[in-house]
Amino acid sequence: MSIVKEFREFAMRGNVVDLAVGVIIGAAFGKIVSSLVADIIMPPLGLLIGGIDFKQFAVTLRDAQGDIPAVVMHYGVFIQNVFDFVIVAFAIFMAIKLINRLNRKKEEPAAVPPAPSKEEVLLTQIRDLLKEQNNRI
């Protein structure tokens, strides 16, 4: 079997295609969440705290010296990324919770058939007795 044919079979398997679609949708979802946090959530939060722009929170470890740029820790950007992560994690949690709920409904056991009635039990016993009598003859 040629490598191209093997690769085609591998790539067209359902799980691989599903994974690729998931990665693409996940990347797009990440951009939406980043915009939500940076453009919708953080500005009002900064306003409530006192007109603070979280992106500007930073600590300068060393000032710029000539051609050497300053060494700065931008912890405000880190705070925004934490918000991004929390929102994405919560969205994934809710999606998995929904999928698990749907799977549980599919896996519900079939209804147990009712116990045979007295007549059915009696008829079964009569049938078995007749079989025994026929086997003796």
From Swiss-Prot:
It comes from the Bacteria. It is a multi-pass membrane protein. Pfam families: MscL (PF01741). Its main location: membrane. One of its GO terms (cellular component) is plasma membrane. Keywords: Cell inner membrane, Cell membrane, Ion channel, Ion transport, Membrane, Transmembrane, Transmembrane helix, Transport. The chain crosses the membrane at residues 10-30, 76-96. One of its GO terms (molecular function) is mechanosensitive monoatomic ion channel activity. It is found in: Cell inner membrane. Gene3D superfamilies: Large-conductance mechanosensitive channel, MscL, domain 1. Channel that opens in response to stretch forces in the membrane lipid bilayer. May participate in the regulation of osmotic pressure changes within the cell. Belongs to the MscL family. Homopentamer. NCBIfam families: mscL, PRK00567.1-1, PRK00567.1-4. This is Large-conductance mechanosensitive channel. It comes from Enterobacter sp. (strain 638).
